[in-house]
């Protein structure tokens, strides 16, 4: 669905200290930005920010970076954070293809990828955020033994991703084909997940650990 351009979004975002519009200048300096030594978790494709908001509220001693491309989406993330007075999140407008230019080695402890585009056509597979091409980029800044938490409702993407993780030096620590009927207790639902679970959608989930 094409988003209607919100010309007012960028000025509002640039006026907030929660939004980092020049993230490449922060490489290796994220702890300085957060003004503490807490671990940093990264969400790739944060959407409207419901997941990130809940994570940050439940874990005030963890710092979070929320990345997405469109100002038209990220402005809603910013407003959620301001409404709840959340200070342990930074919003980054960025094409994820450039993510390794933003973080230094060992700077990120955990990555969340929730319901990314499945890119089902073979010629588009390399655009998947779990493809080996992207995993190799994440390994440049993910700590040893760091984790990627991955959720999807697309069976093809889920099964292909298991192979991508294994080929890229990750071990699968947890996996379920029906998250909401599993024994996993630490799930926070995204807006998409909430809507479509009520319509019968099954969510698949895995935790991959960097060896």
Curated annotation (Swiss-Prot):
Transmembrane segments: none annotated. S-adenosyl-L-methionine binds at residues 43, 68, 95, 117. Substrate binds at residues 121, 153, 190-193. Residues 123-128 are annotated as: Interaction with RNA. Keywords: Methyltransferase, S-adenosyl-L-methionine, Transferase, tRNA processing. It catalyses: guanosine(46) in tRNA + S-adenosyl-L-methionine = N(7)-methylguanosine(46) in tRNA + S-adenosyl-L-homocysteine. InterPro entries: SAM-dependent_MTases_sf, tRNA_(Gua-N-7)_MeTrfase_Trmb, tRNA_methyltr_TrmB_bact. GO terms for molecular function: tRNA (guanine(46)-N7)-methyltransferase activity. The keyword Cell membrane does not apply. GO terms for cellular component: tRNA methyltransferase complex. Pathway: tRNA modification; N(7)-methylguanine-tRNA biosynthesis. PANTHER family: 3-DEOXY-D-MANNO-OCTULOSONIC-ACID TRANSFERASE/TRNA GUANINE-N 7 - -METHYLTRANSFERASE (PTHR23417), PENTACOTRIPEPTIDE-REPEAT REGION OF PRORP DOMAIN-CONTAINING PROTEIN (PTHR23417:SF14). Catalyzes the formation of N(7)-methylguanine at position 46 (m7G46) in tRNA. Belongs to the class I-like SAM-binding methyltransferase superfamily. TrmB family. This is tRNA (guanine-N(7)-)-methyltransferase. It comes from Clostridium tetani (strain Massachusetts / E88). The lineage of its organism: Bacteria, Bacillati, Bacillota, Clostridia, Eubacteriales.
């Amino acid at each position: 669905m094409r988003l209607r351009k919100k010309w007012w979004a960028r000025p509002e975002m640039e006026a907030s200290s929660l939004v980092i519009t020049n993230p490449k200048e922060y490489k290796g300096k994220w702890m300085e930005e957060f003004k503490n030594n807490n671990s940093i978790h990264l969400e790739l494709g944060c959407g409207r920010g419901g997941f990130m908001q809940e994570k940050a509220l439940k874990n005030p001693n963890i710092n979070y970076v929320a990345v997405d491309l469109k100002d038209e989406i990220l402005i809603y993330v910013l407003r959620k954070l301001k409404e709840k007075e959340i200070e342990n999140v930074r919003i980054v407008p960025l094409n994820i293809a450039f993510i390794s230019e933003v973080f230094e080695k060992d700077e990120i402890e955990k990555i969340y990828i929730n319901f990314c585009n499945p890119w089902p056509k073979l010629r588009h597979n390399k655009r998947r955020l779990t493809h080996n091409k992207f995993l190799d980029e994440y390994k440049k800044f993910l700590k040893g033994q760091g984790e990627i938490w991955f959720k999807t409702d697309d069976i093809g993407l889920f099964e292909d991703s298991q192979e991508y993780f294994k080929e890229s030096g990750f071990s699968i620590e947890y996996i379920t084909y029906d998250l909401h009927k599993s024994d996993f207790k630490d799930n926070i639902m995204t807006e998409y997940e909430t809507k479509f679970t009520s319509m019968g959608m099954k969510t698949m989930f895995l935790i991959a650990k960097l060896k």
